[in-house]
Amino acid sequence: MAESQRASQELGINVGQTQLQPGQSARRGVRDSEVNYSGPSVGSQILDGILGAGQQIAGKWFEHNVQQEVLRGERARMAGEAEEAVDSNVLAKPFVKGGWRKQDYRIAQADFSLKMQRFIANKGREMTPEEFRKYLSQEATHVLDSTEGMNPNDALQALAQQQKAEEQLFGMQAKAYMDWSIDQAARGFRTQGNSILAKAVQAQATGDELSRQLSLEEAGLFYTNIMTSEDIPLEVRDKVGMQFLAASLDMNQRGIYEGLRDAGFLDSMSFDDRRALNGLYEKSKAQTRAKESMATLRADADFQQRVANGAITDLAEVEAYSRGMVEEGRWSDAQAISFMTKAMTGLGNAQRMQGIMAALEAGDINALHTLGTNVTEALEQWDKMQAANGSSLTDRLVQGTQLGLRLGTFPKTYGESVGSAVRMIQAAKEGEANPELVNTLNSIFEQVASAQEINPSAGNVMLSGIPEAEQGAVAWALKQMKMGIAPAQALREFSANAEVVKQMDEFEKGQNTKAFKDNLGKQVNDKFVNNIFGRAWNMLTGESDLSNNEAVLSMYRRATIDEANWLASDRKHAGLLTSDTGREALLEIAAANVRNRTIQVGEGRNLKEGDLFSRRDSAPLILPRGTTAEQLFGTNDTETIGTVLAEQHKPHVEGLLGYKSVVAFEYDRTSGSLLAVEYDENGVALDRTRVDPQAVGKEVLKRNADKLNAMRGAEYGANVKVSGTDIRMNGGNSAGMLKQDVFNWRKELAQFEAYRGEAYKDADGYSVGLGHYLGSGNAGAGTTVTPEQAAQWFAEDTDRALDQGVRLADELGVTNNASILGLAGMAFQMGEGRARQFRNTFQAIKDRNKEAFEAGVRNSKWYTQTPDRAEAFIKRMAPHFDTPSQIGVDWYSAATAE
């Protein structure tokens, strides 16, 4: 009985107490299965027998017990509460409306129905309807046995209920059998389809395009086979076909879907199915793009890193990669040129790297420009080189800071490292900060402090490279260091002060902000501007090299005040507004941000005239906050932008009475106009000229492309037009000279010599090609030469001349590359022996007597015969006669040495 009660409870039926409520039971019938069993049920057969054989006694039993049974039936009816709900459930109905006397029958019938439903869901679905009938007949025996002892009326109703229950069970089994049979038929299709998809995926993964194409063709035939098969019903064909296409898209085998779609095999598909498949198709494409994009990004990052590290030196590979990035729309022309330039000038170019290292250590900005780089790029390459040589991060940061501040630069890569150290020290509890980290930061700050004693802008230079989030802390620490407080302690105090400020009310914060803004005009004076944006170039007077024109100073003042006001309004800087030291630090941050947005237009001091103490021959273009050079000019090469602008609008214009007017630049973000404004010596605007920034940007890109082509030619060779003939040449040499310099020198030399395919009379005999000497007298007369042979002889002759030039330079104390090449050119033209006959000229070179040198050359027979070449020699030798300080002032070392 316990098992029967458990089974009944699983059906949701409690004997003697129904839980059905109106509307809870949904009507179900045999019709749901769409398959009806027409054979006789066991219950109907027994019912027919009882109706025929027991007709006489049935009436008596009914007459005797009618009142009692009606009462029982009424009670049951009342307990049901909802007849419609009860009628819809043939299993619950006996418990509610029949008024059965025997509880055992009701439980037995419920157990029977539950058991048969479970059986149908498992093994029963594999039986034919006839096999199931036999099984059901056996299982129904104990249910019919439980009707024994009932009065005829109860028995009749019980058997009728059993008949309905069996009819429902037969319908359920017939539908389950049909589904199972169809599934068995479709299983073969599914197995074959999965095999085809697996082969397609494997072929795609291994890159076997032939196998993949065969798999796609097989998949198309398979789909058409499904849709025309007589082994499965039409609706099942559609279902299996849909499943196959969905699976193919899920596995990113879109070629199957595309082929069938394009061939028209999907035209008869329903709109809903087509819409569903199209959604899966688009999803598959998006997934593939995401995977390919991620893989491409990883591959790109790896390739670019290898190029940066000098591991890839094949320019053809780099060029093909860059061209592909442009064609795919992932890079602009400017980005491609920049990448190729970095490849040409990266760590893989050992000779060039040696030149960069030497220029950095000498503080020679001009030499860096000759090498085609700027201070920031050079410092970053220096850092990579030091890292490759095993230098620690601490040593690299400290030495790099010294080199950078010496040249007025603090790269953002250095700033990020400092910012990271600041965050870690601030996060550590007192006494728990990493000692090495603390020492590193102390050393860096000491370098800055030493530089600030000589040049007040050094600290601001550093701040311009620090991440925005750490600028406040670093500016505060720099100020505190002047008062003897260690950087780590100052950083912790800054954090503590920030916590205190958080507790301040808004009124107090507002008062601090107002006080700071009200005092800005007094603080941002000319002295502040000169100290921050200039450099202490005149060691005698202490003045900076910044232009003293009122218009230029006013630009810096306005930009700094505007930036300071903006920073003061940001609540994260509230901690700096609570003290004089903090306010000074905030002002330094403002100036650093302005520095970052300033493009210097011009070449700096007037080195050509040898004026060491002149102010800077340049003017600023201060971009508004939020505007970048990339947005305005289409390139971030601010150095070349400044050069181009200076050529188009000279920073200084000589006046009729001897004074100089200044040309500065103003950009109005609202109107998008860039103006070159000429100011007189009092800062009054004289003229305004509109500048086309896009045209400037195009010129910058052209120059960078030309520079790249020249570098490519120096490294790998290029055709150079000489007298209308292409002569192949490069910068390779055995003297150890920079290839770029040698390439340019050879191009210049070739134009002087000119190309002649037939031997021509020379001073001592005959020459051919590009000045190749054939011998004295008539030796070589009538000789002809091809451009290829002429190029080969020219490379050999110039290489020999370079060795001679280096030898002469060593004897004469010449170290400048341009001047060494000047001596090599002299040796190429007349030979080393004849060159040495210029004894007085060589002595003037040795004595660095520029006037005597120039006089000696211009008064020579050589000058009379080939004046252009002699003048070129004078020009190339000019850097040798400049003092070392004029080539690259190492103000930092000179000042600290004092």
UniProtKB/Swiss-Prot annotation:
The gene is: gp36
Keywords (A to Z) from UniProt: Antimicrobial, Bacteriolytic enzyme, Degradation of host cell envelope components during virus entry, Degradation of host peptidoglycans during virus entry, Glycosidase, Hydrolase, Viral genome ejection through host cell envelope, Viral penetration into host cytoplasm, Viral short tail ejection system, Virion, Virus entry into host cell
Task: State the reactions this protein catalyses.
Answer: Hydrolysis of (1->4)-beta-linkages between N-acetylmuramic acid and N-acetyl-D-glucosamine residues in a peptidoglycan and between N-acetyl-D-glucosamine residues in chitodextrins
What biological process terms from GO does the record include?
A: defense response to bacterium; killing of cells of another organism; symbiont entry into host; symbiont entry into host cell via disruption of host cell envelope; symbiont entry into host cell via disruption of host cell wall peptidoglycan; symbiont genome ejection through host cell envelope, short tail mechanism
Q: What is its main location?
A: virion
Activity as a function of temperature is given as: The enzyme is highly thermoresistant, but not thermostable.
- GO MF: lysozyme activity
Top class in the EC scheme: hydrolase
State the species of origin. Pseudomonas phage phiKMV
Q: Which residues form a coiled coil?
A: none
Could you tell me how activity relates to pH for this protein?
Optimum pH is 6.
* Cellular localization per UniProt: Virion
Cellular component, GO annotation: virion component
Carries keyword Cell inner membrane?
Answer: no
Function, as annotated, reads: Component of the cylindrical core that assembles on the inner surface of the capsid during procapsid formation. Plays a role in ejection of the bacteriophage DNA into the host cell at the initiation of infection. Functions as an exolysin that catalyzes the cleavage of the host peptidoglycans.
**EC id:** 3.2.1.17
- Locate the compositionally biased regions of type Polar residues: 15-24
Q: What is the recorded name of this protein? A: Peptidoglycan hydrolase gp36
Q: Where is this region: Disordered?
A: 1-35
